[in-house]
Each structure stands twice: as C-alpha cells, then as structure tokens.
Design a protein with these regions (language model features):
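Conserved G/P- and acidic residue-centered "switch" motifs that form tight phosphate/ATP-binding loops
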Residues: 50, 71
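Aspartate-rich (DDxxD/NDxxD/DxxxD) Mg2+/diphosphate-binding motifs
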Residues: 54, 64-68, 75
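A feature for the membrane-embedded catalytic helix bundles of lipid/isoprenoid biosynthetic enzymes
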Residues: 2-14, 18-21, 41, 72-225
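Active-site alpha-helix of zinc metalloproteases
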Residues: 45-46, 67, 99
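Structural signature of hydrophobic alpha-helical transmembrane segments
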Residues: 36-44
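Short, hydrophobic transmembrane alpha-helix segments
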Residues: 24-35
C-alpha cells in the first residue's frame, strides 16, 4: 500500500464516524422502536471508533499534525450532533449544547493560534505547559474517563428515547419501576460529562495566554518620517 493510500485509511475512519453519527440521530428521529435500538448500538460504535484512526495511523506510519487536527474536528462534530439532537428532542436542556459548543469554539480557536506557533494539542510539541494541564487534557485516564462519560450520557439518553417509542407502541424497554433510576442516571451522566468537558477546556485557555495576549510586531518601515 503506497503512502497516499495509507493516509486515506484513518481519514476514512474519521469520515465514517461522522456519517454514522448522522445515521444514529436519523434513526432516533423515526417513530420506531427497532430504529431506536439500532441507533443506541450505533452511538456505542461511533464513540468506540474515536481512537481507531489514531491506532491505524500509528500502525501505517502516517501520523501527522493534520490528522490530529482532523480527528479533533470529527470529535467536535460528533459531540455537537448528539447534544443538539438531544436538546431538540427535549432530553437535555438547551444550556447543555450551548455550553459544550462555546467551550469547543474557544478551545479550538486558541489551539489554532498555538498551532500557528508550531504547537499541537497533544504529543511532543504540545501547547500544555505543566504536568497538571497535560494530565487534564492529554492523559489516557482523563481522555478515557471523558469518553466513558460521553458514551454513558448518549446511550442512556438514547435508551430513554427508545423507551418513549416502546411506550407509544404499548410496551416498555425498561421496567417501569426502574425508569426513574434510568432518568436520574442519564441526568447525572450529562452533568458529569459537561463538567469534565469544562475541566479539560479551561487549562487549554490558561496555557495559551501567551498567544492570546501576544503583542503584534510593528510593521516594517512604520514610524515618523
């Protein structure tokens, strides 16, 4: 496999994740219990595919800064797709996607500024300055914890929508006695996910202060004659 084709493999995985996220919300929108069930499975698949492109890139020897940026962009799109949909479906308050999206735009803006200075979000050229901020933003533990919390939130919200479809058909997915517990778990997962999202975003802004408050150099030839 030549190098150009090798680059396509992880990029196709990234594109596939985004496409499956759209398919999942499309299925959740249908008034069908089987469709909702398939959507919940797809949510798990989409989140599980998060690190697959990176694994393939390392195995094929085609890791690049562009690939890392593309992966982060796909993460944002997938997150926003689900949060916006669940807000529209009245499963979460509108404040959730507003907070998540605001954090995403701010963090990605400062990361873009750091990238212009040769710094990356993760890896050897990371923009993170201290061990604490590197732990919060780039450690495997925090990334896995955030991934698990997102998966739990999206799956539980999807199950609640599947339950609504089942109720409309005169049945149920979750025993009625356990429905209240499921709703509470979903609410908790959402709050924890938002909190982790902010906890991983604030350090990025703090560690990029040199780029945010950089004083522009005067243009050459400027000054009084």
């Amino acid at each position: 496999m030549n190098q150009r084709k090798s680059y396509r493999v992880p990029n196709l995985v990234i594109a596939g994740r985004v496409a499956l996220a759209f398919v999942a919300v499309g299925l959740l929108s249908l008034p069908s219990l089987p469709a909702a069930g398939v959507a919940v499975v797809l949510i798990v698949v989409v989140i599980a595919m998060d690190g697959l492109d990176g694994i393939l890139a390392r195995k094929l020897g085609v890791m690049s800064d562009f690939g890392a940026v593309l992966d982060i962009t796909a993460d944002r799109i997938v997150e926003h797709i689900f949060w916006i949909y669940f807000a529209v479906a009245h499963q979460v308050g509108v404040w959730v996607p507003l907070v998540i999206m605001t954090r995403s735009f701010v963090v990605d803006t400062v990361r873009g500024m750091a990238f212009a200075h040769g710094k990356t979000a993760f890896g050897g050229a990371t923009m993170m300055r201290s061990s604490v901020t590197r732990f919060l933003t780039a450690s495997r533990f925090m990334r896995n914890l955030y991934g698990v919390s997102k998966t739990a939130a999206f799956v539980l919200l999807g199950l609640l929508m599947a339950e609504a479809r089942a109720n409309a058909e005169g049945g149920f997915v979750v025993p009625p006695a356990a429905l209240g517990a499921l709703e509470s778990l979903a609410d908790l997962a959402v709050v924890v996910t938002v909190a982790l999202c902010l906890a991983r975003g604030v350090p990025v802004v703090l560690d990029s202060r040199d780029y945010l408050f950089e004083r522009p150099e005067p243009a050459s030839g400027s000054g009084n004659a």
